[in-house]
Amino acid sequence: MREGFIETKGGRIWYAVYGEDKRATPLLVLHGGPGFLSMPQGVSDFAVDRPVYFYDQLGSGRSDQATDKNYYSVKNFVNELDEVIKELKLAEVILMGFSWGCGLACSYLLEKEPKGVKAIILSAPYLSSPLWDKDQREYIAKMPSEVIKAIEEGEKNGDYGDEYQEATMKYYQKHVCNLEPWPDYLQEAFEKLNMEVYLTMWGPSEFTISGKLKNFDLYPELPKITVPVLLICGDRDEAGVKTVKDFQMAFPCAQMAVIPQASHLNQIEQPRIYQVIVNEFLKNK
């Protein structure tokens, strides 16, 4: 593994590459959040025959903080991704997005129309805030009454204190990561979540959307993306199975896999199944 920094207009961007000497089309991994960070666990294993690149978006993980929180916008993250691809000299690349990283990947294809992106892998895909909100409301309605009450009162009063946070964690244990306990690296990643980025772009939790992405919706635009697409979700994923199926049907050239007994972070809950699915898609690419 080699790591370094890329100088961009917004600041220094951290990156790492595994399998740099391999010959197949490189993977570039786009992490979720916004404000989360790259987690190589499980994903770096794809470096058997191809380079796998990770980078932390500005304001996240090991990259610089933006000097002004107004920097955090879809447009700037798309431009940043464009800079990263050019600086890493990835003439051909397969984009691999996780959650928000899927929205970023598709926004990049729609806005920049790059010639070098040969395929995209969308894991636990977030592509539409209205559809995301619909799925979360359906999940919340099935939670215990005390959890529903804490969430509803928190959202109504704008009080995201202890009761709301406790309810949020119960929801996360069911729909974000169902491992018990959570791996140390996942706990550490959540502790390093940049709340300024997350609140600015998203909101106080996965199901309360109040930031700049509140009206984000790529669903009507998906037919314009013509490269091969793989969509992956867990059977209890925040990205609901029916919604992901709708995404698949919207893309001209897409396939979909549902991982059993898995939620949003299905790549660490069911790593063997996840790797079989992705490796099959990557054959001859």
Descriptions of predicted regions:
Residues 152-227:
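Alpha/beta-hydrolase
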Residues 1-12:
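N-terminal cap/lid segment of alpha/beta-hydrolase-fold proteins
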Residues 53-100, 276:
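Active-site loop/oxyanion-hole signature of alpha/beta-hydrolase fold enzymes
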Residues 118-162:
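Flexible "cap/lid" loop of the alpha/beta hydrolase fold
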